[in-house]
Amino acid sequence: MKTVGLYLLTALAEILGCYLPYLWLRQGASPWVLLPGAASLAVFAWLLTLHPDASGRVYAAYGGVYIAMAIAWLWAVDGVRPSPWDIAGVAVALGGMAIIVFQPR
């Protein structure tokens, strides 16, 4: 469970780090949002180093969690309800992530 929490925190840091520059570029927010955006991306990179597996495996498994978090962000922040296809895609991605993360060692 600790690993899944770390993946969720990593995804949140990346999404926030990308969303803040988006607010500046597309929504007219102050350029000051770039500072916490850059800090969030730095935290994201640091969090990736805390994952216990080899980097390639971490990145592959992290992709599934990122997809799930991005769809949750779509709903919570953008106010767009996910379609059944979005939910199916998340299920497939998380299934792949689970196979990679919880494989026998």
From Swiss-Prot:
Q: Where in the cell is it found?
A: Cell inner membrane
Write the record's keywords in alphabetical order, separated by commas. Answer: Cell inner membrane, Cell membrane, Membrane, Plasmid, Transmembrane, Transmembrane helix
UniProt keyword annotation of Oxidoreductase present:
no
Entry GO CC: plasma membrane
Q: How does it sit in the membrane?
A: Multi-pass membrane protein
Transmembrane helix as a keyword?
yes
Which superkingdom, per the lineage? Bacteria
Pfam families attached here? UPF0060
Q: Which residues cross the membrane?
A: 4-24, 28-48, 60-80, 82-102
Homology family: Belongs to the UPF0060 family.
* PANTHER family xrefs: UPF0060 MEMBRANE PROTEIN YNFA
> What is this protein's record name?
UPF0060 membrane protein Rmet_4032
The species this protein belongs to is Cupriavidus metallidurans (strain ATCC 43123 / DSM 2839 / NBRC 102507 / CH34)
